[in-house]
UniProtKB/Swiss-Prot annotation:
Organism encoding this protein: Mus musculus
A GO BP entry: positive regulation of skeletal muscle hypertrophy
The name this protein goes by in its record: Protein myomaker
UniProt gene name: Mymk
This protein's record includes keyword Cytoplasm: no
Main location: membrane
GO cellular component: Golgi membrane; plasma membrane
Segments on the Extracellular side according to the record's topology features: 1-3, 51-64, 111-113, 175
Assembly description: Interacts with MYMX.
Annotated family: Belongs to the TMEM8 family.
Keywords in alphabetical order: Cell membrane, Golgi apparatus, Lipoprotein, Membrane, Myogenesis, Palmitate, Transmembrane, Transmembrane helix
Length: 221
């Protein structure tokens, strides 16, 4: 019986894989991204908890609303991670971020279970990044960004992201509990790898202000 209960709770517990992602994003001064990851983890955890045995008391919202925000948060996390990788200056950064916030909300409401809810943001972000980087390469007549970014950050990050989506859409029927839990872990790892080592746009006038985990929680709530 204990094994059955543990198996049912595993998707909920595996959503905690986003906690290190939140912590790392905060340390790298990607505060907005950290709040999005925390938002995603919160709704993913409660969405799965509502399916758990005897945990219906945790369903503080309707099941479909929890599902909506868990999927919306996941897609938005992909978008903000890729926009952080693009390293835009203002006002492009806030403009593209808000573009994702609005369009992903509409797309998720229209069809939250299709491939498009994830492929749309990923494809659009990839196109935007490609245009910017190709322009940079043309200006400097060389590779942009550095080769190490491709080998240590982009390559591994995209591999884990591709693995996560493959698990999500093609292998969950094998064993939903374990496959979906690995999906959470692969997705969280992808976000960590894609985030730059430091947010250059956060300012460098002295030491950055401390943003605690409790502050992030209060902001999201």
């Amino acid at each position: 019986m204990g094994t059955v209960v543990a198996k049912l709770l595993l998707p909920t517990l595996s959503s905690l894989a986003f906690l290190p992602t939140v912590s790392i994003a905060t340390k790298r001064r990607f505060y907005m991204e950290a709040m999005v990851y925390l938002f995603t983890m919160f709704f993913v955890a409660f969405s799965h908890a509502c399916d758990g045995p005897g945990l219906s008391v945790l369903c503080f919202m309707r099941r479909d609303i929890l599902e909506y925000f868990s999927i919306y948060g996941t897609a938005l996390s992909m978008w903000v991670s890729l926009m952080a990788l693009a390293d835009f200056d203002e006002p492009q950064r806030s403009t593209f971020t808000m573009l994702g916030v609005l369009t992903i909300a509409v797309r998720t409401f229209h069809d939250r279970w299709g491939y498009g809810v994830y492929s749309g943001p990923i494809g659009t972000a990839t196109l935007i990044i490609a245009v910017k980087w190709l322009k940079k390469m043309k200006e400097k007549k060389g590779l942009y960004p550095d080769k190490s970014i491709y080998t240590q950050q982009i390559g591994p990050g995209l591999c884990f992201g591709a693995l996560a989506l493959m698990l999500r859409f093609f292998f969950e029927e094998w064993d939903y509990t374990y496959v979906h839990s690995f999906y959470h872990c692969a997705l969280a790892m992808s976000f960590v790898l894609l985030l730059p080592k430091v947010n250059k746009k956060a300012g460098n006038a002295g030491a950055p202000a401390k943003l605690t985990f409790s502050t992030l929680c209060c902001t999201c709530v």
